[in-house]
Curated annotation (Swiss-Prot):
Its EC number is 1.8.4.11. GO terms for biological process: cellular response to oxidative stress; protein modification process. GO terms for cellular component: cytoplasm. This is Peptide methionine sulfoxide reductase MsrA. The gene is msrA. The lineage of its organism: Bacteria, Pseudomonadati, Pseudomonadota, Gammaproteobacteria, Enterobacterales. One of its GO terms (molecular function) is peptide-methionine (S)-S-oxide reductase activity.
Length: 213
């Protein structure tokens, strides 16, 4: 049955792996900037993005001024506290995602959205480049109504920018309220800092997000 399972097809909750009640252990500090991996300072906000393999996505965001911390994990699915191996089966419903804690006085949520749209291909469905499966889908998981509004508005602007550039593909990015974010195993946290020559499939399509009118 596993051999015939199509990892590009979304699953329902009744088909998801059971997972576990025990959360994944999380390192206390981010290895790049030594900030807390879990705490959100009072004046900061959280965003969650999925853009394919989370290794390159996490690096993209930790390099941005105003980003306090980043974490690789899983979001948008059903299985509680999944392992990486479980997510790779396509039977958890989760996407590989990155949790971004940021200071809105330094970098705004719309600026993070610009990084999101311009640094991956949001029109590939259940894949990102050579990485194939529902875990690699493009998604924005919103935590406030303001984030949801901004995400949907930027979606429309980027879709029009693609059309204007001669790209007639439809955006497949999933925009929905964030469910639980489950931290990935420690080996996946800040992976490209620990493994500078590691795999990074991140890349845009050469289209820029136009300024908000």
């Amino acid at each position: 049955m596993i051999a015939n399972f199509d990892k590009t097809q979304p699953i329902g909750q009744s088909d998801a792996l059971p997972g576990r009640t025990t959360p994944m252990p999380v390192a206390r500090l981010h290895v790049v900037n030594q900030h807390s991996m879990t705490h959100v300072p009072d004046h900061m906000e959280v965003a969650i993005f999925a853009m394919g393999c989370f290794w390159g996505v996490e690096r993209l965001f930790w390099q941005q001024p105003g980003v306090y911390s980043t974490a690789s994990g899983y979001c948008g699915g059903y299985t509680p506290n999944p392992t990486y191996r479980e997510v790779c089966t396509g039977k958890t419903g989760h996407a590989e995602a990155v949790r971004v804690v940021f200071d809105p006085a330094v970098v705004s949520y719309p600026q993070l959205l610009q990084l999101f749209w311009e640094n991956h291909n949001p029109a590939q469905g259940m894949r990102q480049g050579n990485d194939i499966g529902t875990q690699y889908r493009s998604a924005i998981y919103t935590l406030t109504t303001e984030q949801e509004t901004a995400a949907k508005e930027s979606y429309q602007r980027f879709q029009q920018a693609m059309r204007d550039a001669g790209n007639d593909h439809d955006i497949t990015t999933e925009i929905q309220p964030a469910g639980p974010f489950y931290y990935a195993e420690d080996e996946h946290q800040q992976y490209l800092h620990k493994n500078p020559d590691g795999y990074c499939g991140l890349g845009g399509i050469g289209v820029c997000l136009p300024p908000q009118g």
